[in-house]
Amino acid sequence: MVMYIFIFFLLIILSKLFTKKYTNNICFIILFIFSAIRFDVGWDFQVYYSLATKFDYLKYSIFITKSETLLKINQVWEKELWLYFVMEPLNKVLYKVGWFLKSPQLIIGLYSFLILFFIKKGLDYKKKKDYEIWLFFYSFPLFYFHSLSTMRQWVAISIIFFSYKYIENKKILKFILCVLIAGLFHYTAFLLGILYFISYLNLKKEVLVFLFFISFFSKGFLEKLLLLDLPVIYKYKVYILTSIGKGGKIIFFLIILLYLGILIISYLDKKFYEQNKNAIIYTCFGCFIYIALIDFGHLGPRMSEYFIIFILYFLDDTEKVLKKKFKIKKYIFILIEFLLLILLLHVDKNHIVRSQLVPYEAFFLNKDKTFHKIIKQGE
């Protein structure tokens, strides 16, 4: 846990040592290095890394039909081979680079760079240069630490986050291009084309209040909807069958508080809502998805991340409203983010199946490249 706490304070200290215009670069570099050199950190790390060691897979094509896939799998059954065949095309490109250079750790570095690069570019566009935004990104359970596990999806999420500039500037072709690229990292991103059209709805705050209340009573309708063979979603039905653990339940209550907090602040300051309308709507819609789909395994939480990430665009304005209305000091926000981090690490350390974060380990300190985070019970 010490390493994670060290990084938290390092983000603060180094950001304060330099002028504000360097904040995004500093935080990007710190989190990139911390992510890129990790070993066996992240729930799915072992799967990603194991595939990256299969240098002989370089011979396989990026584009392969379903029948060819089944034929190859029948000839040589390997879990990693199946994963390669079914993953999205741009992920295969990254793996081929790693295999060509015979560097398994490179794939971790490439994913880490892409995720944080597009987050940084999005913040640069909006001229958001506050280290507290990065602290929130680092400490909030659904963001940075999830990106250490679901790397493919988080590249897609970060690209969608970056595409917000094209929504604001009404550049639909560039937005569509971003969605297409994101979808080639994770197919669920194709569904995010809806963001562009939501921006034209001009939703009132009352609609967000309505969504908050019905999110607790949508189970029956959504259950029938998810059981249909909907485009893209049908590929991820397995997540509907996967139960949410203790950590997911804690995040559930955090999301409720987050949604309520955004609504309250929106009513306290009309200018706040008007200036950040699209980002607020997307974030609240993400909260709605998380709350409404909490009983359906991991599908809801994972889809909600595409939307909730937009909170980074108005986090500093939220702080300004709270300072103005309630005279809350800056250190209170930092304390809350620190407590979120401690809570996250505590839950992870005591996970009933396997810790994904604790302890932190760098790849150059693990000479034999052995996975140490063993399963405590049947996963």
For each feature predicted by the language model, list its residue ranges:
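Short hydrophobic/aromatic helix or loop-helix immediately within or flanking a transmembrane segment
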Residues: 46, 50-54, 64-100
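Membrane-embedded helix bundles of polyisoprenyl
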Residues: 132-150, 154-161, 188
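Transmembrane-helix signature of polytopic, membrane-embedded enzymes
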Residues: 22-26, 123-140
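Alpha-helical transmembrane segments and terminal signal-anchor/GPI-anchor hydrophobic tails
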Residues: 41, 46-50, 55-64, 84, ...
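Transmembrane-helix motifs of polytopic, lipid-linked glycan transferases
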Residues: 109-126
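Start-transfer (signal-anchor) and selected internal transmembrane alpha helices
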Residues: 1-31
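Membrane-interface transmembrane helices that cradle and orient dolichyl/undecaprenyl
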Residues: 160-173
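Signature aromatic-anchored transmembrane alpha helix within multi-pass, membrane-resident enzymes
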Residues: 210, 323-344
